[in-house]
């Protein structure tokens, strides 16, 4: 049997892509960037390999978006921050919006949990403290309505 290094370039790229996908879900954009970086001399072959993986349902931006949204919610990120992170990873804007909308998360409750984790359950005693907490929640991706 041939070693992976001796395989034809297309099989070598597919093998590396499968290794990456076995560890975690990747967006097509992420996977393409990693494969082109690993195999710059075979960059034109990466597109067809990715198309085959998508056709075989081994790579899915939908699955990646769902898994990534769950992970970011678990880390206490709000919808704006999640949307931005998905777009940075090459997920289509409409798919990002759809995935966040389908997510059954109470953003108000999550904002409260995040604030209590950071600041405890002590109420704000000054305007400056309230502004500090609001900025923190905005940084985490919550909108003004969810912060109130």
What are the functions of these language-model segments?
Residues 1-148:
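An alpha-helical, amphipathic repeat domain used for nucleic-acid recognition
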């Amino acid at each position: 049997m041939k070693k992976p290094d001796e395989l034809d370039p297309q099989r070598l790229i597919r093998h590396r892509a499968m290794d990456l996908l076995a560890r975690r879900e990747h967006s097509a954009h992420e996977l393409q960037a990693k494969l082109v970086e690993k195999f710059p001399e075979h960059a034109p072959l990466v597109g067809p390999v990715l198309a085959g993986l998508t056709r075989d349902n081994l790579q899915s931006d939908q699955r990646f978006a769902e898994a990534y949204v769950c992970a970011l919610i678990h880390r206490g990120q709000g919808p704006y921050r999640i949307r931005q992170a998905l777009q940075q990873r090459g997920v289509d804007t409409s798919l990002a919006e759809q995935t966040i909308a389908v997510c059954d998360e109470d953003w108000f409750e999550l904002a409260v949990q995040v604030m209590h984790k950071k600041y405890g359950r002590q109420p704000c005693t000054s305007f400056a403290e309230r502004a500090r907490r609001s900025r923190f929640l905005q940084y985490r991706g919550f909108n003004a309505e969810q912060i109130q």
